Design a protein with these regions (language model features):
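Residues that form generic nucleotide/phosphate-binding pockets
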Residues: 96
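Active-site acidic/histidine clusters and adjacent loop/turn architecture
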Residues: 88
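Acidic, serine/threonine-rich low-complexity disordered tracts
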Residues: 1-83, 99-197
Length: 197
């Protein structure tokens, strides 16, 4: 991946230009890759390590996005910074293609700056139907699931585009703070994530 193709999450959040990787560029890098887009630009990140299901995806400038079952559970090196997000109880995100409409999720967020710790947020999931989604040069028919977040100053929607066969989240838009969301697109998934759930 060339230097011009890899930009950090920090750049994405601070208004640097977007990055549009090609299928050939992604294929040339042996590591799993995601594209993360903030309010004003994008970054390509590679999978660095996995610890008990928590994946750490790194940019060239060492900004990090942490995912678990495709859900953003932390960021590092950007502002705002999601220091931690935990789900209370069982996570529906491991098999999002099988959820019942109206399923609720209890979340707890720790966000910097301003030491916003322990923010309790309820997510309500709704199945919106199948949609065609373009990723690189492929078109996929994916199940669109919306999660409406409310509580503790939050009023945002998360969106997930999920493989209807195995529940893998190919694309999502997820809040990392009450006023900031990231778009995450799987360019070259970690192969074990594609197994049936």
């Amino acid at each position: 991946m060339g230097k011009t193709s890899v930009k950090s999450v920090q750049m994405a959040l601070q208004g640097k230009p977007d990055v549009e990787p090609t299928a050939a560029e992604v294929a040339a890098n042996r590591f799993p890759q995601i594209k993360v887009t903030g309010p004003a630009g994008g970054a390509v990140l590679v999978l660095g390590n996995i610890d008990s299901g928590r994946q750490a995806w790194y940019s060239s400038e060492r900004s990090i996005v942490f995912l678990n079952d495709g859900v953003v559970v932390g960021t590092h090196g950007s502002s705002p910074e999601l220091q931690d997000m935990t789900l209370e109880g069982d996570s529906p995100f491991h098999a999002l293609h099988r959820i019942a409409d109206g399923t609720t999720v209890q979340r707890r967020y720790d966000v910097m700056p301003d030491y916003r710790y322990g923010m309790k947020v309820t997510g309500t999931l709704a199945i919106l139907g199948k949609e065609k989604v373009h990723i690189l040069e492929s078109k996929r028919e994916l199940l669109h699931v919306r999660e409406r977040l409310q509580g503790d100053g939050w009023k945002r929607d998360n969106h997930y585009w999920v493989d209807p066969a195995n529940g893998f989240i190919w694309k999502s838009i997820q809040a990392i703070a009450p006023d900031t969301s990231l778009e995450v697109v799987q360019l070259k998934p970690y192969s074990q994530d594609l197994q049936n759930r």
